[in-house]
Design a protein with these regions (language model features):
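Conserved AMP-binding A3 loop
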Residues: 41-45, 182-206
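Structural core segment of the AMP-binding/adenylate-forming
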Residues: 60-61, 81, 88-160
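AMP-dependent adenylate-forming
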Residues: 19-43, 150-153
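Conserved AMP-binding/adenylation subdomain of ANL enzymes
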Residues: 205-222, 230-272, 282, 286-288
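Flexible, low-complexity linker/hinge segments
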Residues: 11, 128-130, 149-181
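Conserved pre-ATP/AMP-binding loop-to-beta segment of ANL
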Residues: 143, 163-186, 193, 216-222
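Gly/Ser/Thr-rich phosphate-binding loop
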Residues: 270-275, 285-346
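Conserved AMP-binding/adenylate-forming core of the ANL superfamily
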Residues: 32-76, 80-84, 101-106, 110
């Protein structure tokens, strides 16, 4: 699991994964995750229980080690529950772009052959068509319902799927390794069809440490990633992985909204927000129209496209002088990362 402290086992000659989530449950009473949209918050204990319910539900449904849980979700609590559950159970979390067409969804389903597929009610029509196109059908298909919609025939609502599942830590009949595949991300397909990128447990642990060292990031921090969580930058650049690993708090932004982002910084005292340069441009425009108190920010982290000098100077003047710039956040994670003091002279 990526939620681990890696320690040497006295009963085996290899590194084993010891989950740090129970430690956070015992020592951290503050929120692990906040959904401003639904005005809901989860402590680490509550987050652990929700992840355990999904873990036990997929185990009861027959998933085995290495089985794939594919989910096409906007940023939402169920994304976090499923992501953690996969690490707990030795299964593979496979988040895919919620903007994919039916044909593209079918391609990823055929390629990864997921045991479990989770979709949002707003994508119901595309998913239903994809299931007809695909030559492979997942064993369990689950709908996250945001709109009171009826699920596709033969599928089940998420709330019903986990309703009777145990909130206790799952019992596994297999061992976990830091070299297990824990997450699979799909490329944009610029050289043909999308291709799955394997990310192992140790990849995710080291990505979390990278963030904790370079931001730096700790259990005192509160983050909000304004980008979708289905790519490396969304998950690992101040997203779910490093924030939960460090014991900080994730604030969910379902879909980017500049005015709401600034409001959440002020209301929830956020310390880090993450987005592409286009996001920073819209934040700057919104801040110039209606200024918010951004004094709690330790930094704004940008990625995804070049950061121009003149634009960077404007963002530093209007938002915060603490602008970070990373490169390589689609599937690989940073291969270049500039902290505020690393930026060229302005």
């Amino acid at each position: 699991s990526w939620l681990l402290d890696a320690r040497w086992s006295s009963t085996a000659s290899r590194m084993i994964a010891i989950s740090s989530l129970p430690n956070h449950c015992r020592r951290l009473l503050s929120a692990a995750m906040i959904s401003p949209e639904t005005k809901t918050a989860w402590t680490y204990s509550e987050l652990n229980s929700e992840a355990n319910r999904f873990s036990n539900a997929i185990l009861d449904a027959g998933i085995i080690k290495g089985g794939v849980v594919m989910f096409q979700l906007l940023n939402c609590p169920e994304f976090a529950f499923a992501y953690i559950a996969c690490h707990k159970t030795g299964t593979v979390s496979c988040p895919i772009n919620f903007r994919l067409s039916a044909g593209e969804i079918a391609i990823t389903i055929e390629d990864s052959r997921p045991t479990v597929f989770i979709y949002e009610s707003i994508n119901k029509d595309a998913v239903e068509q994809a299931l007809k196109l695909s030559k492979f059908t997942p064993k369990m298909i689950i709908m996250v319902d945001e709109e009171g919609a009826a699920p596709i025939p033969g599928t089940v609502k998420y709330s019903d799927f986990v309703k009777n599942a145990s909130a206790e830590n799952p019992n596994l009949n297999w061992n976990l390794s830091i070299y297990d595949e824990t997450t699979r991300l799909y490329t944009s397909g610029t050289t043909g069809r999308p291709k799955g990128v394997c990310i192992t447990s140790i990849n995710e642990v080291l990505s979390a440490h990278d963030v904790m060292i370079h931001f730096p990031f700790s259990s005192e921090d509160k983050s909000m990633n304004t980008t979708p969580w289905f790519h490396r930058g969304g998950l690992h650049s101040g997203g779910l992985t490093p924030t939960f690993y460090a014991g900080g708090c994730v604030t969910i932004m379902r879909k980017f909204d500049a005015a709401l982002t600034l409001k959440y910084v002020e209301d929830y005292k956020l310390s880090f927000i993450i987005g592409v340069p286009a996001v920073l441009e819209r934040l700057t425009e919104a801040q110039e129209r209606n200024g918010r108190d951004l004094s709690t920010l330790h930094g704004i982290v940008t990625m995804g496209s070049p950061l121009e000098r003149a634009a960077c100077m404007r963002y530093q003047r209007v938002l915060t002088p603490k602008i970070f710039n990373g490169y390589g956040t689609t599937e690989t994670f940073w291969n270049t990362f500039l902290r505020p003091n690393d930026l060229p002279e302005m």
